[in-house]
Design a protein with these regions (language model features):
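Generic detection of well-ordered alpha-helical segments
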Residues: 73, 80, 84-88, 138, ...
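Generic structural marker for isolated residues within well-ordered, non-membrane alpha-helices
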Residues: 75, 110, 126
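Short amphipathic alpha helix immediately N-terminal
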Residues: 81-121
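DNA-recognition helix of helix-turn-helix
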Residues: 118-123, 127-157
Length: 162
């Protein structure tokens, strides 16, 4: 069961990090499907004797996109529910992406966010940078894990896994 939860959390983390790219990709694929010249064409018998239904094929492709669109909607809803501090954290976490190297035993995104977070918060609030500096990096990993867990629970309630 732990392996299943870890796999789901990894899936959720990817959706959280890549939401903007995936949303653009989904929109492009939807547009491609809808602009396909075969949509709306009559059914055409093929050489094998099977009937091709271009509109049906397009509908099936659009149905596949609906699952991905439900994930995007979920991620956007979760973002809206987050407190401002965590929403800004998530923006920075996305910016950092999946920096792969470890810096003193921590994933590379942690020091990146630890550096940028107080700067962004100070800029947005007009307060001093020092007011937002968190010396303990575990705060950021705890926020990240909490966002992942919350998103995974909501996704499970909506039947988005398997």
């Amino acid at each position: 069961m732990n392996a299943e939860f870890r796999a789901e959390n990894k899936w959720v983390a990817a959706w959280l990090l890549e939401k903007n790219e995936r949303k653009a990709d989904i929109a492009a694929r939807r547009e491609e499907i809808l602009r396909s010249p075969s949509v709306g064409m009559p059914k055409i018998p093929s050489r094998s004797g099977k009937v091709s239904d271009p509109t049906g094929v397009a509908a099936a492709k659009l149905a596949e996109l609906q699952v991905e669109e439900r994930w995007i909607a979920l991620i956007e809803e979760v973002e809206k529910r987050l407190p401002d501090k965590q929403r800004i954290f998530l923006e920075l976490r996305r910016e950092a992406g999946n920096l792969q190297c470890d810096i003193r035993g921590r994933p590379a995104w942690v020091p990146y966010v630890q550096y940028k977070y107080p700067l962004v918060m100070a800029e947005r609030t007009g307060k001093k940078v020092a007011e937002f500096y968190m010396s303990h990096p575990n705060t950021y990993t705890a926020w990240w894990n909490r966002i992942i867990e919350y998103t995974a629970r909501v996704a499970a309630k909506r039947g988005l896994f398997g």
